Amino acid sequence: MTVGILGTKLGMTQIFDEAGRSVPITVVQAGPCPITQIKTPQTDGYTAIQVAYGEVREKNLSRPERGHLNKSQTPPMRHLREFRLEDVSAYQLGQAITVDIFSPGQLVDVRGTSIGRGFAGYQKRHNFKRGPMAHGSKNHRLPGSTGAGTTPGRVFPGKRMAGRMGNTAVTIRKLQVMRVDPERNLILIKGALPGKPGALVSITPAKVVGRK
């Protein structure tokens, strides 16, 4: 895994490429993320760096959290994330990770939390087909059969049913970076990202899985 950055989703807009075509993009306010801890095989059993993001008031953190951040002389920050690396010799405590680690045209993976929809039914949550809407039908939005009868005499785990929808971790892979603005700590990514405006997102270089 390679080092990434944390940011806040600001919202969506559009830009125009060299051919004049409209490109939908999401604007992310990313970093700077100071390094708060460097983990090594001798002390932790693996190699990684921990970064912080999102300044808060000191009273919003517990005493152990403040003590942990003070070791790297980092101001009070809300979020901590780890990025596993093969070699951490190029990093040191307090070093800031900024958006200039990315470049236009690069592919990235973005991880965030999807918008919570609350308790949702079968059609909205799983795209079930509805029943007849006329001719005396009483099955409009019912699920249909949930299993067999006496044998097995139960509903198998994993059966798609109504329940809470959204508010889960979502990773969208291989999105293209359109522009990077180091002065304003902005990164423009093609397409939609998970979560509402103001949501926390993690951006890492794309991990190639299977065919490109």
UniProtKB/Swiss-Prot annotation:
GO BP annotation list: translation
Matching InterPro entries: Ribosomal_uL3 (IPR000597), Ribosomal_uL3_bac/org-type (IPR019927), Ribosomal_uL3_CS (IPR019926), Transl_B-barrel_sf (IPR009000)
Region (Disordered): 127-161
PROSITE patterns (alphabetical): RIBOSOMAL_L3 (PS00474)
UniProtKB keywords: Ribonucleoprotein, Ribosomal protein, RNA-binding, rRNA-binding
Domain of life: Bacteria
Gene Ontology CC entries for this record: cytosolic large ribosomal subunit
One term of GO molecular function: rRNA binding
Annotated function: One of the primary rRNA binding proteins, it binds directly near the 3'-end of the 23S rRNA, where it nucleates assembly of the 50S subunit.
Similarity comment text for this entry: Belongs to the universal ribosomal protein uL3 family.
Alphabetical list of PANTHER family matching this protein: 50S RIBOSOMAL PROTEIN L3 (PTHR11229), LARGE RIBOSOMAL SUBUNIT PROTEIN UL3C (PTHR11229:SF16)
Oligomer and partners: Part of the 50S ribosomal subunit. Forms a cluster with proteins L14 and L19.
Name of the protein: Large ribosomal subunit protein uL3
Gene behind the chain: rplC
